[in-house]
Structure formats: C-alpha cells, structure tokens
Amino acid sequence: DDDLDARVLEHIDAFFAGLPAAGPDHEAATRGPWWFFLSEKVVAITQGRSYFVWDIKVGRPARVLSRYVTRTPAGIGLGSPFTMQLAIQEAGLPRVLYASAGGAIGKVIGRKGLFYELVGNQINAIDGPTEYSAYPSNVSAKLAPKDPDAVAARLSAAIRERVPEPWRSTFGGTVIMDANDIGRNVLGSDVPGDWTRFEEMFADNPLGQGSQQTPMAMVFLREDTAQA
C-alpha cells in the first residue's frame, strides 16, 4: 500500500510540476473539476492479491466448472482453471456451485449475468492471464482489490495534501476502475453519488487493455464544453 501511494504521488507531483511549462492550452484544460482514476489491477497487485499461475493450486472443481464459462476477446474471466480456483477460494465452493446452477438457469431463460449476481464477492473483477497483457499480467491471475473505497479515500487524502491551489479545491476524489474493451465497472471510490458518469467517461477504455502500461489517469472536466 505504501508503494502504491508513493507511485501515485510521484505521478501527481510530476504532472503539476510540468503544467506551467505546458502552455496556456493545458492550463485552460485543467481549470474544471477533476478526478484521479486508477486501474483496479494495480491496487490488487500492491495488496498481494495477484498470483503467478504456477503458484495457484487448481482443484478438480475449478477445472470442471471453468469449462462451462463463455470466454470473450476482452478477457478470460472465469474461463480458466486458475481464475475459477481463485473464485472458489474467495467465495467458497458451495456459493460458486449455487451461482453456477443459477447461471445455467439464467442462460435458459435469457438472463445474462445471473451467476455474478448470485456469487457476489466482486468475483466479476477476477482477471486471468492473456497473451496481449504486459508482464506479469500475461502469466498471473488476480482477485479484485480489497476495500477499494478505503484505498480511494486514502489516496485522495494524500493527493489533497500535495496538490497546490487551485487544483486542490477542484479535486473531486479517486475512482478505482475495472475496465476492458467491452465494459467498465467502478469497484471503489470516495466520491459520493452516482458513479455511472465515471463509467461513461471510460466508455472507450482510455487506460488500454494490452501493452499500454497506463494504469493511472487524471480526468478534467472541460469548462468550455462541460465534457471530460
């Protein structure tokens, strides 16, 4: 967690230190309200909730259940024995079996996502290894970050202590985002109210899904357009 805070503040400091030299266009673009966005994957890694696949002891239930999961080009989901094993460890085998039965019924009646509704525990945020991901994500599987709301609040407090005015006053808070090329979901934030607007801001997945290695973003609301 300390390493995460230090990395975040390093980038925040560098951004505002370089802003005066960036010119009037950049100064104008940063006058409005702004938020700090952070990939949930980075939070999970710093919490020790990411595991190399060779360290995950896969049981028979995980091997069997993972065969029935629909895979998409945007991510492996629970369609891997490794990610399914993490789901079982996180939620418990009885609950995963219960949710699997419900999910099967959901497919019959045309209701998508019933498995994740029933299993809970942010199992939908579990990620597995993909070829297009940068190391170590190409050889690891991870759980959702723990206590993401608390992490967001802690980072926001640290940012407010470091950011100069007037940006300190216009800072809205931190958003921990789970995004890929087919969807996005706010896992945690210290910003009150509806988080739908933040998911809409990330409709085109600006942090990327592959080798971009851009897990952080500062999003400013343009005063002249009222758009992020």
Residue ranges and their predicted role:
Residues 1-228:
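N-terminal and secondary-structure boundary signal
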